[in-house]
């Protein structure tokens, strides 16, 4: 900024670039820098302002916009303000980064007296901006004070202010150079802004840029005759020239301390940048400086209108700071023109907010490489902003950037994010590339309207990419923003190669110049990004080139998703950006040249979709996506990943600066979007090839079903451009944006709107039938490019979103993820189904993504969200996984992937789309992500091969519960896989993994799709803490492995469950979340493998992905935590008896047929204090429970998949509900939870319940709880049968599985939301066996006190605890009840799940359970379980009302399972005396109690009322009998006793009252016993007054009452304030009337 101003003023600004008191440039420069920054961060004018806010300058810039008019009005005041310079600086410091402040200060230092004035103007403008920016520009990413957040966007007003204030005629401004504050014409007009613009250096002839720019300006902004510069167009041209010089000379000043007027070749973008449409079209023809300036002003207004006011204000402020930039726009642009490598992106619109209408081109002006380079070099040294802009390639990028800004909004938000948190933007180069790309697109589109610009963006991908690169470099610290920008730009231009980008950049440069404010923004970015740039300064040049290399790939990705970019620069691009950020870190390979080429292809398809989905999900879920943006191409994929990972945990870490993960705070949608953008760039190349159509479709337009869910997520991401923001800031801005977005959307200048954060879906997405899911699975391969990548993105993006939540975890995961990440992209690239399968097999982080890929086809969006991190990413755990996953996807191409290239699973999953599974290896990526590096490695083996991964089991186990997953041994076998499936889920993954399982059912080759799904889901559920139990669970085989599984899973699950539950941050974070995803995917694969005997696993995985996407689609509506719970729900699915048990255990806590049942479950669980396990512990332990569930549920899984779907009522069409209710249904029920259908259904229903009833922690717990419980619930009516049958044998180890299975009951599948993790840990060992007989009782007790028996208790306990309330509170412990308990709970959960219809289901289910139990002994056993579940559900509901339900459950447990089942089943059943009666009586007892209470109260009230009525009647009687005497004008000193004494002379007084009034006479009422006494008092009462008193005003009291009973001022009633109805006479003394009257009076 200082440099630019210096060039403008022909004074070398201080190398630091502090704002100098430029005649016109000081303020203007400062403003410009601010603006420059703001656009960078905001993706539009507002973006700039917001970015400034983020940096602290954002606010000042916004203020500048508002300050503009005041500056014009107060040109002299600006000087006065200079006096307040220090104060202003102090004020701004809170809002501005030290760099910007230093720029301002430095400006003053290096400037002449002119600079002092400029500084004054700048300070004034900045101060005003800071004061007003908040209200003016509400950017989700702005670090603007609450005031701005609270203030609604001043769209038009800000724009007009800015336009009016921002530009004085060029002549004025140009004249101003002589008189910095100078001639009042320009200086007074722009005050601070104009002053800086008007500098002696401004006399330089305008550079070609301004000329080019000014022609543009006319198109979108008619040239105004405003003499902003105080000089004629020539001065403006000089300004342009100066501006160019400033870019070059900026560096020169910074470096050489002199303006380089020769930098005329630099094409600067003046206001046309701010108003790209007008500027680009009209201004392009008018080169006159004055015209541009005038047009800038006029155009700025138009620009402001075009863009959202909040956006424009930033641009406006920038323009104002720019010294009425529009008038001087060209000159200013040159001044602001960043150094050679710098890319100045001027975003007129805020794509994030506006979405498609973001037409504000991000003007990345390429300064001549020659002079610019030198200046830039020095500038880099002096000015961070310059450093950022300096990258060697920046000149090329700059050339490209100048006019290509199709998604300036996105870009700006990205820039804003970058500027806001440079520390978070470790990869300055790569992020710069993305930003440069958008900048280039912005410039390209600048000439045309924003839409046209968007098209241009596509047309000019090279320039865009280059510009993005420039910009990314410029705003290294705004990498998130850069990524977003690049994403938006990449969508259209990333396809093109570097050379193309460069050529296009040159063309774009000739086409249009970056605006002055864009340059200022670039300068600001340079300053802010300088840190990052410095970090990557060594690699800046190479990194620049690498970035360009990456940029082309990114462009490829972007072009792969042109629809996204085109769809909505803000929305689609933002979303892609988010995705890219989330995935790009993983695709970090794209950052390095080598990585870019290899990783781009690999990550290309994979990252884009997944990342897009993941970022969106993360955004939607408020999870902070970590974006790893490789800084240099030289980094290897692994290096990039490592850097990304490191960057994610330590965004500011210089070492991983290249592929640094840019974390977006979960609550910062913009930042998430930015991260997504960064990831998207890396992943977009792949997407473009395979996923582009779908990714773009879902993200841009939700074309694909799975992508639809993703699209909504993407839309969210797109809407909210990720930008480093604190959680509080993000929340504030989100709220603001929600309110403001509405206003802005309604307002014409929607283009500049900030993307409004999409609200978490409150309603469950329609759950596709599990059967349809299978087709969807097949579709998944088709969608693989999009769905799978998105899924992967989700998987990886969860890592990205998770980075912040689990920085350390991410780091751990990152290591493994790095390899798996890359592999995952490959897997993702293949059809989503394979990828999900691969993902599960691969790194856990991939697991979530892998599930997501399957989901994209149908259920994926819904389920993947919870399981794949799409839904889960919102959850805190998913975010952990996303960081590693994206990185892994990108950076770890084939390590785990190749390692675990479990081609068999993918081979098994050929139907899923073996082509898509060309990346089979990627699935192993999941394992890597899943655990720490070791852990992830294990899951991959299990995940991909599902049978072959025995070896990885140990790593899995080592990682956490995941290691214990032992998928290698058990996964290979169908039962084992099912069992294994749950273990991965045990940790946080439980929720996530489960969703993948639901997907499985649709495509499950073995048995019902749901069957397949349960397996994978169960593993997912158990994957985490249950991982240790997983190996035992893995032996899903009913009896053979039950013992090993039983002891190990139980023990390990308990340990892991408790460990992850309570303290699974490392495991849970990395494994929990990442592993969850991995397990989810892997469990899917496992389950499917078990079902198809390893071959179907692939198919199952495929099917799982499809249902998952469906679930994902629904899940978005559900809260992230709830989504995770949903994920968990499907997880519990046992292939064999043990699997069934484990499925039950796994699902115990998470069962829920629908939201209502979920809520019920949750309520019961919470209400029930029997399960003391902490929600968090349960949440952590969810994975453990999940692990067990899959094994237990596997046998039942196949049958239950359809049945569960029907039972849950989520996919009734797909599966006949009664089919699975048969004895086989027991297994089916258990597996149902895992089945894709049930998972999807549960995901759908359960998200509802979870969303409503369970908090995120509760959701996790419920996931864990439901992991064990699914077996029971999953069985549905047969659940109790299966449960009873299975509990004794495998209950100890398989309880979790059983639980998972339990909740798989048709209704229960969604009902089972209780995480059985904790419960599983505490109660599983004991309840396992005992629960069979008394599952409810044990579950209740275990639930309350024994977190060590999660397997059994979870299933049973979860049933009651599965209720929304209980799920959270008791879900942790309840999942420990015996299988029966779990079954009962599942059953009950099913009812609860369905809540409204769930209760009806309860009866039906209970009856069904009874019939089933009587049907067969196994069914009987399961039936008792189911019936217990039903009872539990009943109690759960009761529990919702009171805490008695736990006791009821206990009683129920005491009762025979069968009896209990029947009782629960039919509340009218005689056997329900104990349990059903209890629960019922409890509920009734509460009623009776309340009733008695009410009666008592009512009685007392009636008595009181009666008394009141009696008094009223008495008074009325007395009044009517004329016994009440009204005494007025009572002296104030008189007391009631005195009054009574005085009037007692006339007779016996029954009552005497005195009423004192502040105003008016005091009065009283005296009631005599006899009327004659009253008459006497009235006649002679006046004689009683004393000499000093006024005569009493005597009359019969209540005379007003006679007229109007309700008016009691003078009534004797009034003295008592009796509420008795005045209007009712004694004759109308009936109780009702009196009561009504009394109430009425009381109201008065």
Curated annotation (Swiss-Prot):
Residues 1-61, 170-249, 429-616, 646-761, 773-884, 978-1074, 1322-1507 are annotated as: Disordered. One of its GO terms (cellular component) is nucleoplasm. The keyword Nucleus applies. Residues 1523-1599 form the RRM domain. Residues 691-702 have a biased composition (Basic and acidic residues). Residues 437-446, 475-496, 556-572, 811-821 have a biased composition (Polar residues). Residues 448-457 have a biased composition (Basic residues). It holds the Pfam family RRM_1. The modification Phosphoserine is found at residues 232, 541, 1059, 1393, 1395. GO terms for molecular function: RNA binding; transcription coregulator activity. SMART domains: RRM. It is found in: Nucleus. Its main location: nucleus. InterPro entries: Nucleotide-bd_a/b_plait_sf, PGC-1, PRC_RRM, RBD_domain_sf, RRM_dom. Residues 1361-1432 are annotated as: Necessary for interaction with CREB1 and NRF1. Residues 213-222, 515-524, 1409-1433, 1453-1489 have a biased composition (Low complexity). Residues 12-22, 828-864, 874-884 have a biased composition (Pro residues). SUPFAM superfamilies: RNA-binding domain, RBD. Residues 425-460 are annotated as: Necessary for interaction with CREB1 and NRF1 and for transcriptional coactivation. Induction: Up-regulated by serum (at protein level). Up-regulated by serum. Up-regulated weakly in brown adipose tissue by exposure of animals to cold. Expressed in liver, heart, skeletal muscle, kidney and white and brown adipose tissues. Interacts with CREB1 and NRF1. Acts as a coactivator during transcriptional activation of nuclear genes related to mitochondrial biogenesis and cell growth. Involved in the transcription coactivation of CREB and NRF1 target genes. PANTHER family: PEROXISOME PROLIFERATOR ACTIVATED RECEPTOR GAMMA COACTIVATOR 1 PGC-1 -RELATED, PEROXISOME PROLIFERATOR-ACTIVATED RECEPTOR GAMMA COACTIVATOR-RELATED PROTEIN 1. This is Peroxisome proliferator-activated receptor gamma coactivator-related protein 1. The gene is Pprc1.
């Amino acid at each position: 900024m200082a440099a630019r101003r210096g060039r403008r003023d022909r004074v070398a600004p201080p190398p630091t670039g502090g704002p100098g008191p430029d005649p016109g440039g000081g303020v203007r420069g400062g403003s410009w820098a601010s603006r420059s920054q703001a656009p960078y961060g905001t993706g539009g004018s507002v973006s700039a302002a917001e970015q400034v806010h983020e940096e602290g300058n954002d606010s000042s810039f916004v203020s500048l916009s508002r300050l503009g008019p005041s500056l014009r009005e107060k040109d002299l005041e600006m000087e006065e303000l200079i006096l307040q310079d220090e104060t202003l600086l102090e004020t701004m410091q809170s809002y501005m980064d030290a760099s910007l402040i230093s720029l301002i200060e430095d400006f003053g230092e290096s400037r002449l007296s002119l600079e002092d004035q400029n500084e004054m103007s700048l300070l004034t403008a900045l101060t005003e901006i800071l004061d007003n920016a908040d209200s003016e520009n509400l950017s989700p990413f702005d670090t603007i004070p609450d005031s701005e957040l609270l203030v609604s966007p001043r769209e038009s007003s800000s724009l007009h202010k800015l336009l009016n204030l921002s530009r004085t005629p060029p002549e004025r401004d140009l004249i101003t150079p002589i008189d910095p504050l100078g001639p009042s014409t320009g200086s007074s007009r722009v005050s601070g802004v104009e002053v800086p613009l008007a500098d002696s250096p401004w006399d330089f002839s305008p550079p070609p840029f301004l000329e080019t720019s000014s022609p543009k300006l006319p198109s979108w902004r008619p040239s105004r005759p405003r003499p902003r510069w105080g000089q004629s167009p020539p001065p403006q041209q000089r300004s342009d020239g100066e501006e160019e010089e400033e870019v070059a000379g900026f560096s020169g000043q910074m470096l050489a301390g002199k303006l380089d007027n020769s930098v005329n070749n630099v094409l600067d973008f003046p206001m046309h940048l701010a108003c790209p449409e007008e500027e680009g079209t009209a201004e392009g023809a008018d080169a006159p400086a004055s015209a541009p300036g005038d047009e800038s002003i006029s155009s700025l207004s138009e620009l402001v209108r075009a863009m959202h006011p909040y956006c424009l204000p930033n641009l406006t402020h920038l323009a104002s700071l720019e010294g009425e930039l529009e008038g001087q726009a060209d000159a200013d642009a040159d001044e602001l023109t960043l150094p050679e490598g710098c890319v100045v992106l001027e975003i007129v619109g805020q794509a994030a907010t506006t979405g498609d209408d973001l037409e504000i081109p991000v003007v990345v002006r390429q300064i001549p490489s020659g002079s610019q380079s030198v200046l830039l070099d020095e500038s880099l040294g002096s000015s961070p902003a310059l450093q950022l802009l300096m990258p060697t390639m920046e000149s090329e990028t700059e050339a490209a950037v100048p006019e290509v800004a199709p998604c300036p909004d996105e870009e700006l938000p990205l820039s804003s994010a970058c500027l806001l948190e440079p520390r978070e933007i470790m990869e300055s180069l790569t992020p710069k590339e993305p930003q440069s790309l958008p900048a280039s697109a912005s410039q390209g589109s600048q000439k045309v309207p924003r839409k046209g610009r968007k098209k241009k963006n596509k047309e000019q991908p090279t320039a865009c990419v280059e510009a993005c690169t420039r910009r990314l470099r410029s705003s290294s610290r705004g990498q998130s923003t850069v990524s977003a920008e690049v994403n938006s730009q990449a969508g259209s231009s990333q396809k093109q190669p570097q050379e193309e980008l460069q050529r296009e950049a040159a063309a774009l440069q000739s086409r249009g110049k970056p605006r002055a404010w864009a340059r200022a923004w670039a300068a600001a970015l340079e300053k802010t990004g300088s840190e990052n740039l410095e970090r990557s300064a060594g690699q800046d040049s190479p990194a620049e080139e690498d970035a360009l290399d990456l940029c082309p790939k990114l462009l490829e990705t972007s072009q792969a998703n042109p629809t996204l970019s085109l769809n909505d620069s803000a929305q689609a691009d933002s979303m892609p950006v988010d995705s890219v950020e989330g995935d790009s870190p993983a695709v970090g390979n794209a950052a390095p040249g080598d990585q870019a080429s290899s990783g781009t292809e690999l990550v290309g398809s994979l990252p884009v979709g997944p990342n897009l989905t993941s970022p969106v999900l993360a955004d939607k879920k408020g999870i902070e996506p970590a974006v790893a943006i490789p800084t240099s191409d030289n980094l290897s994929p692994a290096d990039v990943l490592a850097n990304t990972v490191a960057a994610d945990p330590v965004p500011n870490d210089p070492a991983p600066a290249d592929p640094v993960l840019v974390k977006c705070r979960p609550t910062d949608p913009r930042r998430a979007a930015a991260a997504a953008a960064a990831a998207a760039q890396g992943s977009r190349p792949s997407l473009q090839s395979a996923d582009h159509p779908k990714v773009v479709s879902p993200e841009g337009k939700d074309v694909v079903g799975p992508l639809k869910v993703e699209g909504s997520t993407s839309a969210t991401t797109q809407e909210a451009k990720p930008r480093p923001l604190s959680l509080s800031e993000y929340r504030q801005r989100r709220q603001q944006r929600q309110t403001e977005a509405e206003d802005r959307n309604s307002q014409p200048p929607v283009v500049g709107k900030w993307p409004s954060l999409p609200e978490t879906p409150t309603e469950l997405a329609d759950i596709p039938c599990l059967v349809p899911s299978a087709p969807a699975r097949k579709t998944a391969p088709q969608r693989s490019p999009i769905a799978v990548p998105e899924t992967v993105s989700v998987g990886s993006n969860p890592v990205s979103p998770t980075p912040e939540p689990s920085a350390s975890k991410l780091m751990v995961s990152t290591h493994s993820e790095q390899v798996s990440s890359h592999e995952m992209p490959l897997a993702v690239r293949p059809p989503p189904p394979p990828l999900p399968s691969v993902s599960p097999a691969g790194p856990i982080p991939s697991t979530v993504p892998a599930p997501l890929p399957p989901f994209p086809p149908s259920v994926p969006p819904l389920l993947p969200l919870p399981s794949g991190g799409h839904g889960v990413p919102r959850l805190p755990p998913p975010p952990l996984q996303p960081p590693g996953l994206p990185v892994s996807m990108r950076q770890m191409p084939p390590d785990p992937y190749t390692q675990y290239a479990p081609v068999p699973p993918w081979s098994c999953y050929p139907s899923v789309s073996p082509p898509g599974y060309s990346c089979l290896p990627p699935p192993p990526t999941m394992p890597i992500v899943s655990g720490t590096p070791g852990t992830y490695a294990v899951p991959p083996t299990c995940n991909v091969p599902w049978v072959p991964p025995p070896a990885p089991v140990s790593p899995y186990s080592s990682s956490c519960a995941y290691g214990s997953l032992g998928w290698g041994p058990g996964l290979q076998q169908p039962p084992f896989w099912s069992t294994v499936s749950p273990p991965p889920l045990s940790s946080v993954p439980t929720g996530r993994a489960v969703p993948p399982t639901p997907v499985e059912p649709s495509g499950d080759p073995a048995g019902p799709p749901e069957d397949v799904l349960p397996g994978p889901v169960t593993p997912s559920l158990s994957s985490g803490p249950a991982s240790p139990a997983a190996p035992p669970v893995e032996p899903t085989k009913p009896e053979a492995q039950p013992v090993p599984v039983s002891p190990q899973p139980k023990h390990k699950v308990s340990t892991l469950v408790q460990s992850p539950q309570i303290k699974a941050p490392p495991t849970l974070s990395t494994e929990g979340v990442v592993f969850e995803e991995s397990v989810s995917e892997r469990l899917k694969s496992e389950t499917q493998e078990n079902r198809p005997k390893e071959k179907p696993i692939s198919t199952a995985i495929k099917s799982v992905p499809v249902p998952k996407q469906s679930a994902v689609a629904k899940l978005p509506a559900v809260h992230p935590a709830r989504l995770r719970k949903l994920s968990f729900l499907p997880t519990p699915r046992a292939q064999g008896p043990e699997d069934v048990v484990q499925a039950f255990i796994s699902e115990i806590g998470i069962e829920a047929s629908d939201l209502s049942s979920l809520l019920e479950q949750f309520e019961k669980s919470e209400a029930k204090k029997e399960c003391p396990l902490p929600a968090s512990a349960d949440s952590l332990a969810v994975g453990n429970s999940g692990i067990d569930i899959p094994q237990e549920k596997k046998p039942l899984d196949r049958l239950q998949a359809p049945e569960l779907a029907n039972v849950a009522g989520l996919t009734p069409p797909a599966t006949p509900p009664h089919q699975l209710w048969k004895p086989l249904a027991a297994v089916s029920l258990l597996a149902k939870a895992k089945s894709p259908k049930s998972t999807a259904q549960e995901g759908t229903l359960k998200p509802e319940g979870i969303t409503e009833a369970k908090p995120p922690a509760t959701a996790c717990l419920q996931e864990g709880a439901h992991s064990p419980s699914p077996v029971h619930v999953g069985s549905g009516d047969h659940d109790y049968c299966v449960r009873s049958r299975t509990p004794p044998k495998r209950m100890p180890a398989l309880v979790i599985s059983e639980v998972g299975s339990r909740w798989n009951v048709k209704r229960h599948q969604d009902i089972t939301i209780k995480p059985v993790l904790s419960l599983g840990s505490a109660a599983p060992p004991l309840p396992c066996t005992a629960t069979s007989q008394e599952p409810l009782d044990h579950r209740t007790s275990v639930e309350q006190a024994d977190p060590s028996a999660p397997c059994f208790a979870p299933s049973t306990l979860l049933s009651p605890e599965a209720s929304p309330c209980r799920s959270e509170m008791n879900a942790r412990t309840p999942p420990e009840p015996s299988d029966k308990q779990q079954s009962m709970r599942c059953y009950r959960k099913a009812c609860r799940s369905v809540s409204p219809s769930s209760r009806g289901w309860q009866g039906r289910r209970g009856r069904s359970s009874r019939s089933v139990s009587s049907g067969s002994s196994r069914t009987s056993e399961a039936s008792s379980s189911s019936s217990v579940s039903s009872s539990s559900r009943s109690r759960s509901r009761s529990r919702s009302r009171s805490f008695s339900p736990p006791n009821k459950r206990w009683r129920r447990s005491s009762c025979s399972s069968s009896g209990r089942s029947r009782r629960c089943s039919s509340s009218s059943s005689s056997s329900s005396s104990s349990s059903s009666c209890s629960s019922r009586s409890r509920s009734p007892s509460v009623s009776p109690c309340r009733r008695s209470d009410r009666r008592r109260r009512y009685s007392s009230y009636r008595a009181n009322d009666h008394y009141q009525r009696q008094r009223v009647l008495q008074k009325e009687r007395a009044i009517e009998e004329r016994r009440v005497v009204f005494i007025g004008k009572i002296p104030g000193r008189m007391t009631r006793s005195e009054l009574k004494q005085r009037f007692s002379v006339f007779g016996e007084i029954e009552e005497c009252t005195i009423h004192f009034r502040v105003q008016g006479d005091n009065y009283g009422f005296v009631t005599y016993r006899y009327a004659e006494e009253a008459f006497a008092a009235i006649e002679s009462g006046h004689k009683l007054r004393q000499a000093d008193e006024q005569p009493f005003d005597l009359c019969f009291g209540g005379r007003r009452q006679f007229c109007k009973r309700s008016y009691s001022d003078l009534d004797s009633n009034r003295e008592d304030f009796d509420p008795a109805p005045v209007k009712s006479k004694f004759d109308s003394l009936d109780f009702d009337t009196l009561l009504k009257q009394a109430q009425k009076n009381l109201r008065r």
